[in-house]
Amino acid sequence: MTQPNTQTTPNDVPAAAEGQHQEQQQQQRRGGGRERRGGGRRGDRRGQERDSEWQERVVQIRRVSKTVKGGKKMSFRAIVVVGNERGQVGVGVGKAGDVIGAVRKGVADGKKHLVKVPLTRHNSIPTLSNGREGAANVLIRPAAPGTGVIAGGSIRTVLELAGIKNVLAKRLGSKTPLNNARAAMVALASLRTHKETAKERGISLEQIYS
């Protein structure tokens, strides 16, 4: 009676060992994927934080029409003010077939036309300034701490999103929200700090204050 041969050779690798090896490789791949995906999420969070720095306010939404060959084409126009309340503000206009699309385009347009506003320690403006756009004329002047924003309409929105806390503004001429907002932007863009004014005039700061 012969006994069966139970001797194993090096080529007879157990199937279970191969399965464990494949599982380890799959876990490593999944781990690497999680790390890569984690980096993507961190990048998305940074982008969201940058976007959260900006505030958006809709000044006006109007339904407008354009006469074409087939008749009138209706759309929406949105006037949007964008600012970070730290000295940067912009006014944008967007047109689209729906309100959401018009506002989105207005925000993008406002970020393309940002103006840097010099602010004082008391969150006011350094000097008196005047801006004109079309038939609208806007006069803004600095105010003492605790005064607040004395302005109305779209001018107030522009000043608040620029981060100005104490200011006086007067609207002269046209009452159109878009022209008034753009006139306020012209006035803010023409502002200069005392140091810049002294350098342009070629005099010292002491002469500016005297």
Curated annotation (Swiss-Prot):
NCBIfam families, A to Z: rpsE_bact (TIGR01021)
Molecular function, one GO term: rRNA binding
PROSITE patterns named among the record's database cross-references: RIBOSOMAL_S5 (PS00585), S5_DSRBD (PS50881)
Domain of life: Bacteria
Domain S5 DRBM, residue spans: 54-117
Quaternary organization: Part of the 30S ribosomal subunit. Contacts proteins S4 and S8.
Function: With S4 and S12 plays an important role in translational accuracy.
Record-given protein name: Small ribosomal subunit protein uS5
Domain notes: The N-terminal domain interacts with the head of the 30S subunit; the C-terminal domain interacts with the body and contacts protein S4. The interaction surface between S4 and S5 is involved in control of translational fidelity.
GO process terms (BP): translation
Organism: Prochlorococcus marinus (strain MIT 9303)
Family: Belongs to the universal ribosomal protein uS5 family.
Residue segments, region Disordered: 1-56
Keywords of this entry: Ribonucleoprotein, Ribosomal protein, RNA-binding, rRNA-binding
Bias kind Low complexity: ranges: 18-29
Listed InterPro entries: Ribosomal_Su5_D2-typ_SF, Ribosomal_uS5, Ribosomal_uS5_bac-type, Ribosomal_uS5_C, Ribosomal_uS5_N, Ribosomal_uS5_N_CS, Ribsml_uS5_D2-typ_fold_subgr
SUPFAM superfamilies (UniProt xref): dsRNA-binding domain-like, Ribosomal protein S5 domain 2-like
Listed GO CC annotations: small ribosomal subunit
Composition skew (Basic and acidic residues), residue ranges: 32-56
Compositionally biased residues, Polar residues: 1-11
Keyword hit for Ribosomal protein: yes
Pfam family, one: Ribosomal_S5_C
UniProt KW Chloroplast keyword: no
